[in-house]
Amino acid sequence: MTRSLKKGPFVDHHLVAKADKAVATKDKKPIKTWSRRSMVLPDFIGLTIAVHNGKQHVPVYITDQMVGHKLGEFALTRTFKGHPADKKVQKK
């Protein structure tokens, strides 16, 4: 189920404040955040946001195609190492 349109997008207030400050001072340093649930707003375009994936902060450069998605979508939490190889000896 999607979020009601009358509620609007959810973004943590501290993230909006940090983004506004970075835009005002033209700071290019990544903004660290643990808020994977926050939605990408048009104000964030051109900023680099370091999203926590449970182990480290992954830098994500925000483009216009990312608007409307959540930050957690761009910082993967699981590493896929591949399926185990078939160890049975094949008959010739």
From Swiss-Prot:
Keyword Ribosomal protein: yes
Keywords: Ribonucleoprotein, Ribosomal protein, RNA-binding, rRNA-binding
Example GO BP: translation
Any Gene Ontology CC annotation: small ribosomal subunit
UniProt xrefs under InterPro entries: Ribosomal_uS19, Ribosomal_uS19_bac-type, Ribosomal_uS19_CS, Ribosomal_uS19_SF
Molecular function (Gene Ontology), one example: structural constituent of ribosome
UniProt xrefs under Pfam families: Ribosomal_S19
HAMAP family referenced in this protein's UniProt entry, alphabetically: Ribosomal_uS19
Family, similarity comment: Belongs to the universal ribosomal protein uS19 family.
NCBIfam families: rpsS_bact (TIGR01050)
PANTHER family listed in its UniProt record: RIBOSOMAL PROTEIN S19P FAMILY MEMBER, SMALL RIBOSOMAL SUBUNIT PROTEIN US19M
Functional note: Protein S19 forms a complex with S13 that binds strongly to the 16S ribosomal RNA.
Name recorded for this polypeptide: Small ribosomal subunit protein uS19
Recorded name of the encoding gene: rpsS
